Amino acid sequence: MKWSILLLVGCAAAIDVPRQPYAPTGSGKKRLTFNETVVKRAISPSAISVEWISTSEDGDYVYQDQDGSLKIQSIVTNHTQTLVPADKVPEDAYSYWIHPNLSSVLWATNYTKQYRHSYFADYFIQDVQSMKLRPLAPDQSGDIQYAQWTPTGDAIAFVRDNNVFVWTNASTSQITNDGGPDLFNGVPDWIYEEEILGDRFALWFSPDGAYLAFLRFNETGVPTFTVPYYMDNEEIAPPYPRELELRYPKVSQTNPTVELNLLELRTGERTPVPIDAFDAKELIIGEVAWLTGKHDVVAVKAFNRVQDRQKVVAVDVASLRSKTISERDGTDGWLDNLLSMAYIGPIGESKEEYYIDISDQSGWAHLWLFPVAGGEPIALTKGEWEVTNILSIDKPRQLVYFLSTKHHSTERHLYSVSWKTKEITPLVDDTVPAVWSASFSSQGGYYILSYRGPDVPYQDLYAINSTAPLRTITSNAAVLNALKEYTLPNITYFELALPSGETLNVMQRLPVKFSPKKKYPVLFTPYGGPGAQEVSKAWQALDFKAYIASDPELEYITWTVDNRGTGYKGRAFRCQVASRLGELEAADQVFAAQQAAKLPYVDAQHIAIWGWSYGGYLTGKVIETDSGAFSLGVQTAPVSDWRFYDSMYTERYMKTLESNAAGYNASAIRKVAGYKNVRGGVLIQHGTGDDNVHFQNAAALVDTLVGAGVTPEKLQVQWFTDSDHGIRYHGGNVFLYRQLSKRLYEEKKRKEKGEAHQWSKKSVL
């Protein structure tokens, strides 16, 4: 389901203001303020996301209007009809899903967040003719975890109390009855949601709606981590904190086991399907996909525990026989779970059926056609660039639409490739630096082309066989007008050459009214994790980084550097960090800082570094080098020791503790000399309710530093009560950025040999 609150009626015929291949710098005199960038986020481009629907006319979609009503609109003609009036929408509606024939709406209400993607809710089915609402479960109490229509609309599968149910014409069948705290049916446990599936469901209907494949997770034996909540959303703290008992497997600990099940909806028969690609205790199922137009074949992408070996196992539904149809060895690094398998069918005159997937088996991530029956794959794209997303598959035209880095790793352009001729066609001018995306209609005849930067984003509507837009969908004219009042930091992009000959992508933000004759402090803002990317030519939000480059009392240059190990520059570039996280990443950030220090407009004595999550870890590893290149470090929600993080993420890059003990020891932040010597000190921030990167990381790091004699003038610590990894509880986010602003101001004003308090010069007796 996609929310949209913007009407498309009356949109411009085409984009009024041409965009430039660089970020805007404004044409006014106003400077961005803290309140505008951090508190209110006042200047933000908008975009619509539509839920395309299949009707007699291609280009129809459903959206929720500003008054709350559900409407169907033709993106081609702008004709609009009301599906559900505003006064018939259920109270406290959070989300909705439309019946395939538009006869009913499935509503989620009474929303309660769980983890990153998951939530609990009540669900109601609304008949569009009578507008009557029926509860999906009569006794529901905000406890349903997931619900989904079949592709044909004959039934709804839903998950409650970790059990799978099927609703058909007001009759409900319970499919599993063993769900509980340690057994999950149809929904992932915490680690599969966070690290593998990246979503809140683990069930998939066959294309014809006859079968349901779902995963069953068994957490028996998985160690428990306790997260305390001191306030627990109360105004006055309870005498005893609420404790969340979370099954959280850390490095080399027991992982949940996973099992594939098939349900035939007509008979209600459920069958477990063994996947023997790897030992059951080692098996990770990364993806489930139906490789058929009906219900003949379902496939799973299976990995070993450390995710450097992969097998695609196809299951014949009729016989339940399984066969490995594709296999990869990635022991030179790791294998990413890209969730990109999709059925194509026969190609050309051949009756052999194929599916498409993204694979970096050539050293670069590209599109490949794999035979469903097994055999040699066919490369659709190739070269020293990478495919990042499959957007649409047009079977009648035999085309795949995709995004790639063909022009540059910091850019995304839209292309199609024919699986008949292998001809690649750009749908945008790929010689102009930009980031694009697109959303295709249900029959593939139209698409919304989204320009995402570096200039102010906009969206145009195209017909698939036209090179000119039909009209503009979103112009963001209000943002363009607002920017006329401001003068903005100047964002530039370049590459730094390492001694090895490799290059690092850099995004530099120069302060407002920059003068090359002045010297400015610098803030490095890395993330730096495996496969990640921060340096992108997408629109850069007018956020905290824009603020510190605008405030006349701060005027910081910011550098964002994508170190070795980050994504979209080929397998060799990213896999160098395997089994030694923190080493090359820190070396690259130090190298970049040393290069920055040589610039005539950089104050080499005031170069700071701040990172969040993996960026917080990387900041710590940089400080640990004791290079002298950085004068201040800020670590927000950092990992400090990979033994403390979850197994499925960590072992993908570090292998097991038993096989790589030396690597784990080297990757932990334990050397204190850099913390003692960093001239402006270090600030460590962490939420006590972080269920992802546990507060344990900061607690252990601070104990190491204090125990080793790091002084109070060098170390400041700030915890955020009950905040999770995003640090937003009870105003924590604004406090965090105010504190960071204060530290950056103090660092800018810090004198190299300033006087200190007398008690800091001698031992305290």
Swiss-Prot record:
<feature type="glycosylation site" description="N-linked (GlcNAc...) asparagine">
    <location>
        <position position="169"/>
    </location>
</feature>
<feature type="active site" description="Charge relay system">
    <location>
        <position position="690"/>
    </location>
</feature>
<protein>
    <recommendedName>
        <fullName>Probable dipeptidyl peptidase 4</fullName>
        <ecNumber>3.4.14.5</ecNumber>
    </recommendedName>
</protein>
<feature type="glycosylation site" description="N-linked (GlcNAc...) asparagine">
    <location>
        <position position="110"/>
    </location>
</feature>
<feature type="glycosylation site" description="N-linked (GlcNAc...) asparagine">
    <location>
        <position position="35"/>
    </location>
</feature>
<dbReference type="InterPro" id="IPR050278">
    <property type="entry name" value="Serine_Prot_S9B/DPPIV"/>
</dbReference>
<keyword id="KW-0720">Serine protease</keyword>
<feature type="active site" description="Charge relay system">
    <location>
        <position position="725"/>
    </location>
</feature>
<comment type="similarity">
    <text>Belongs to the peptidase S9B family.</text>
</comment>
<dbReference type="Pfam" id="PF00326">
    <property type="entry name" value="Peptidase_S9"/>
</dbReference>
<dbReference type="GO" id="GO:0005576">
    <property type="term" value="C:extracellular region"/>
</dbReference>
<keyword id="KW-0378">Hydrolase</keyword>
<feature type="signal peptide">
    <location>
        <begin position="1"/>
        <end position="14"/>
    </location>
</feature>
<keyword id="KW-0325">Glycoprotein</keyword>
<dbReference type="GO" id="GO:0006508">
    <property type="term" value="P:proteolysis"/>
</dbReference>
<feature type="glycosylation site" description="N-linked (GlcNAc...) asparagine">
    <location>
        <position position="465"/>
    </location>
</feature>
<comment type="function">
    <text>Extracellular dipeptidyl-peptidase which removes N-terminal dipeptides sequentially from polypeptides having unsubstituted N-termini provided that the penultimate residue is proline. Contributes to pathogenicity.</text>
</comment>
<feature type="glycosylation site" description="N-linked (GlcNAc...) asparagine">
    <location>
        <position position="218"/>
    </location>
</feature>
<dbReference type="GO" id="GO:0008239">
    <property type="term" value="F:dipeptidyl-peptidase activity"/>
</dbReference>
<dbReference type="InterPro" id="IPR002469">
    <property type="entry name" value="Peptidase_S9B_N"/>
</dbReference>
<dbReference type="InterPro" id="IPR001375">
    <property type="entry name" value="Peptidase_S9_cat"/>
</dbReference>
<dbReference type="GO" id="GO:0005886">
    <property type="term" value="C:plasma membrane"/>
</dbReference>
<feature type="glycosylation site" description="N-linked (GlcNAc...) asparagine">
    <location>
        <position position="101"/>
    </location>
</feature>
<dbReference type="GO" id="GO:0008233">
    <property type="term" value="F:peptidase activity"/>
</dbReference>
<keyword id="KW-0031">Aminopeptidase</keyword>
<dbReference type="GO" id="GO:0004177">
    <property type="term" value="F:aminopeptidase activity"/>
</dbReference>
<feature type="glycosylation site" description="N-linked (GlcNAc...) asparagine">
    <location>
        <position position="490"/>
    </location>
</feature>
<keyword id="KW-0964">Secreted</keyword>
<feature type="active site" description="Charge relay system">
    <location>
        <position position="613"/>
    </location>
</feature>
<dbReference type="GO" id="GO:0008236">
    <property type="term" value="F:serine-type peptidase activity"/>
</dbReference>
<dbReference type="InterPro" id="IPR029058">
    <property type="entry name" value="AB_hydrolase_fold"/>
</dbReference>
<feature type="glycosylation site" description="N-linked (GlcNAc...) asparagine">
    <location>
        <position position="665"/>
    </location>
</feature>
<keyword id="KW-0645">Protease</keyword>
<dbReference type="Pfam" id="PF00930">
    <property type="entry name" value="DPPIV_N"/>
</dbReference>
<keyword id="KW-0732">Signal</keyword>
<feature type="glycosylation site" description="N-linked (GlcNAc...) asparagine">
    <location>
        <position position="78"/>
    </location>
</feature>
<keyword id="KW-0843">Virulence</keyword>
